[in-house]
């Protein structure tokens, strides 16, 4: 079974720096697992690694999509698994847990269907009846029209959602690290990083995307708030406060999700022995017989 390592954790926890050290020491190639860093132009606000910071380490699925192009977790699953086949020693790096799980665990996503417009209540009830007949084991939120429509199209295309039960079965031999960090220290880092981003031209970056790529995705922490600031909805101070608040809320959800879904090796991001501990675990993992 192929061996794959992943470095996860909240923003500003040190994933990038540690990943480069691991990749260089063990001759690994990095597969980006940050759903925002796949896009071109989104550089400062996503803390995208620079060419200099890469130190010659090869990166995949990074900075390759035009800002207005649609790309889903389905596309990432296909792209990442293709990369895994091509790369001898992959190292996933990023905080997008759903993307990571889709790439590494035994379930297949299907393309999201185009949802029909103006579906009436009668149509939804017909769809529900077919779902209950064809897939009676499925537990479905019957008050969510999008869920009903999506489940219906799954059945029409021959996929029963209730049978997609292998979500916790890995396709590969995995070593997943989660960089844990004291919440107070994380907040300090988030505030400092945001100030650095603003000094480096984050506002100008958002303005450029707004002007040249009006259909681009702004539903990203930081980009949404700066866009609202540029549109006069609130001051830069309010925007900064909202960015920090949302980043910390997201970090809390991330931690819970990763621990529950992926059972990672949790390591202290602030520990003086972090590098030594991780290197030893990686060495043991790569050299043990699978």
Swiss-Prot record:
Q: Which keywords fit this entry according to its UniProt record? A: ATP-binding, Magnesium, Nucleotide-binding, Transferase, tRNA processing
Cofactor(s) demanded: Mg(2+)
The set of disulfide-linked cysteines is none
Which InterPro entries does its entry note? Dimethylallyltransferase, IPT, P-loop_NTPase
Q: Where is the chain membrane-spanning? A: none
As its record notes, the protein acts as a catalyst of: adenosine(37) in tRNA + dimethylallyl diphosphate = N(6)-dimethylallyladenosine(37) in tRNA + diphosphate
Tell me the segments the record calls region Interaction with substrate tRNA.
34-37
- Site for Interaction with substrate tRNA, residues: 96
SUPFAM superfamilies from the xrefs?
P-loop containing nucleoside triphosphate hydrolases
Positions of ATP binding: 9-16
One GO term under biological process is: tRNA modification
EC numbers for this chain: 2.5.1.75
Q: What class of enzyme is it?
A: transferase
- Functional description taken from the UniProt entry: Catalyzes the transfer of a dimethylallyl group onto the adenine at position 37 in tRNAs that read codons beginning with uridine, leading to the formation of N6-(dimethylallyl)adenosine (i(6)A).
**NCBIfam families, per the entry:** miaA
Subunit and partners = Monomer.
Similarity comment: Belongs to the IPP transferase family.
Name this protein carries in UniProt: tRNA dimethylallyltransferase
Which species does this protein come from?
Answer: Phytoplasma australiense
Organism taxonomic ancestry: Bacteria, Bacillati, Mycoplasmatota, Mollicutes, Acholeplasmatales
């Amino acid at each position: 079974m192929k061996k794959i390592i992943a470095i996860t954790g909240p923003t500003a926890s040190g994933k990038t720096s540690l990943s480069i050290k691991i990749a260089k020491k063990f001759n690994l190639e990095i597969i980006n697992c940050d759903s925002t860093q796949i896009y071109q132009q989104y550089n400062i606000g996503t803390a995208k690694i620079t060419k200099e910071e890469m130190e010659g380490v090869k990166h995949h699925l990074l900075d390759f999509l035009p800002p207005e192009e649609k790309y889903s977790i389905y596309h990432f699953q296909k792209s990442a698994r293709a990369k895994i086949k091509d790369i001898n020693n992959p190292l996933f790096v990023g905080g997008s847990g759903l993307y990571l799980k889709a790439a590494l665990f035994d379930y297949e996503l299907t393309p999201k269907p185009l949802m029909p417009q103006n579906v009436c209540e009668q149509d939804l009830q017909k769809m529900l009846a077919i779902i209950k007949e064809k897939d009676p084991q499925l537990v479905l939120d019957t008050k969510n029209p999008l869920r009903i429509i999506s489940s219906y199209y799954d059945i029409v295309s021959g996929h029963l959602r209730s049978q997609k039960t292998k979500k916790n079965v890995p396709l590969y031999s995995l070593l997943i690290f989660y960089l844990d960090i004291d919440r107070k220290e994380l907040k300090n880092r988030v505030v400092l990083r945001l100030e650095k981003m603003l000094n480096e031209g984050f506002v100008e970056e958002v303005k450029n995307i707004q002007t040249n790529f009006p259909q681009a995705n702004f539903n990203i922490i930081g980009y949404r708030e700066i866009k609202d600031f540029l549109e006069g909805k609130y001051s830069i101070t309010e925007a900064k406060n909202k960015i920090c608040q949302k980043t910390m809320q997201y970090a809390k959800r991330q931690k819970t999700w990763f621990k529950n879904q992926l059972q990672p090796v949790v390591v202290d991001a602030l520990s003086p022995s972090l590098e030594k501990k991780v290197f030893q675990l990686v060495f043991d993992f790569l050299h043990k017989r699978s």
